[in-house]
Amino acid sequence: MSLYPSLEDLKVDKVIQAQTASSANPASQAFFLNVVDSAAFPPGGNLYPKLYPELSQYMGLSLSEAEICENMPVVSGAPTQGQLVARPSSVNYMVAPVTGNDAGIRRAEIKQGIREVILCKDQDGKIGLRLKSVDNGIFVQLVQANSPASLVGLRFGDQVLQINGENCAGWSSDKAHKVLKQAFGEKITMTIRDRPFERTVTMHKDSSGHVGFIFKSGKITSIVKDSSAARNGLLTDHHICEINGQNVIGLKDAQIADILSTAGTVVTITIMPAFIFEHIIKRMAPSIMKSLMDHTIPEV
């Protein structure tokens, strides 16, 4: 079963497959040519002139043939037998004729499974990390920019399963911070589950440059009817954590809007249910989130 980063990709891929199947079946076309009066054909001789929509204008998207070929090279010609098409790491199962090889999707990808990171304290004895207890688990509340925690790829919402081999289940926030404070500074080993409360939604801007949602204080409040946001299942009462992999927590709405407007035609946002988000950031001043939170664009 094929997987797609967005509904637009699924629909366009179906159109491409149907057009390819039609052009690759001359026997079928010959049969219809024998039974249908050629005088009934529309100008240009196309048997099915409006059976499938033109890809240049589809679902509110502007898709020229050049853009399709650039984002999905396989469309321009079928691969020869045995030829492998290189695709990016863990998203290689995605079929993306519209989205293509988008860096934002790769930066925002939530990886399933558990990983281990090793970090050390800086010259001040810090690792640039704040933790929060949620439902008997320990979660990342804050990652400071250019800190050891940031350099090993920790993100807001990551779940910490172990610190130096000790299970964190049932710990309080204070105990987690105490263990980190007392840990040997040269090597701290942490076992991490990647952002279990978060999910990503990939959308495509329409001709006016919008994806179709309204937010206030970083929280999604409304979805525009028939927009890409609506088609791809974006929900209200969710907080925006990242845009194309860039953390936007603590930023003003105008700053978030600017990041959205300057993003490309494909926008992938990472969201978290509001009640969980608000619990994680509880007792953390907005000024701390704005000034200390790592808002850099991650490398891919």
From Swiss-Prot:
Keyword Membrane: yes
The PDZ domain, residue ranges: 116-195, 200-274
Region ranges (Interaction with PDCD6IP): 2-104
UniProt GO BP: negative regulation of receptor internalization; negative regulation of transcription by RNA polymerase II; positive regulation of cell growth; positive regulation of cell migration; positive regulation of cell population proliferation; positive regulation of epithelial to mesenchymal transition; positive regulation of exosomal secretion; positive regulation of extracellular exosome assembly
Modified residues (Phosphotyrosine): Y48
Binding, a 1,2-diacyl-sn-glycero-3-phospho-(1D-myo-inositol-4,5-bisphosphate): K252, D253
Post-translational modification (record): Phosphorylated on tyrosine residues.
Pfam families in UniProt: PDZ
InterPro entries attached to this UniProt entry: APP-Binding, PDZ, PDZ_sf
Alphabetical keyword list: Acetylation, Cell junction, Cell membrane, Cytoplasm, Cytoskeleton, Endoplasmic reticulum, Lipid-binding, Membrane, Nucleus, Phosphoprotein, Repeat, Secreted
SMART domains xrefs: PDZ (SM00228)
Motif LYPX(n)L motif 1 in this chain: 3-7
Primary subcellular site in the record, as a coarse category: other
GO molecular-function terms, A-Z: cell adhesion molecule binding; ephrin receptor binding; frizzled binding; growth factor binding; identical protein binding; interleukin-5 receptor binding; ionotropic glutamate receptor binding; neurexin family protein binding
Motif position, LYPX(n)L motif 3: 51-55
Localization in the cell: Cell junction, Focal adhesion; Cell junction, Adherens junction; Cell membrane; Endoplasmic reticulum membrane
Membrane topology of the entry: Peripheral membrane protein
Modified-residue entries (N-acetylserine), positions: S2
One CC-aspect GO term: plasma membrane
Residue positions, PTM Phosphoserine: S6
Function: Multifunctional adapter protein involved in diverse array of functions including trafficking of transmembrane proteins, neuro and immunomodulation, exosome biogenesis, and tumorigenesis. Positively regulates TGFB1-mediated SMAD2/3 activation and TGFB1-induced epithelial-to-mesenchymal transition (EMT) and cell migration in various cell types. May increase TGFB1 signaling by enhancing cell-surface expression of TGFR1 by preventing the interaction between TGFR1 and CAV1 and subsequent CAV1-dependent internalization and degradation of TGFR1.
Summary of subunit composition and partner proteins: Monomer and homodimer. Interacts with NFASC and SDCBP2. Interacts with PTPRJ. Interacts with SDC1, SDC2, SDC3, SDC4, NRXN2, EPHA7, EPHB1, NF2 isoform 1, TGFA and IL5RA. Interacts with PDCD6IP. Forms a complex with PDCD6IP and SDC2. Interacts (via C-terminus) with TGFBR1. Binds to FZD7; this interaction is increased by inositol trisphosphate (IP3). Interacts with SMO.
PANTHER family in the record: SYNTENIN RELATED (PTHR12345), SYNTENIN-1 (PTHR12345:SF10)
Name of the featured protein: Syntenin-1
The organism's taxonomic lineage, starting at the top: Eukaryota, Metazoa, Chordata, Craniata, Vertebrata
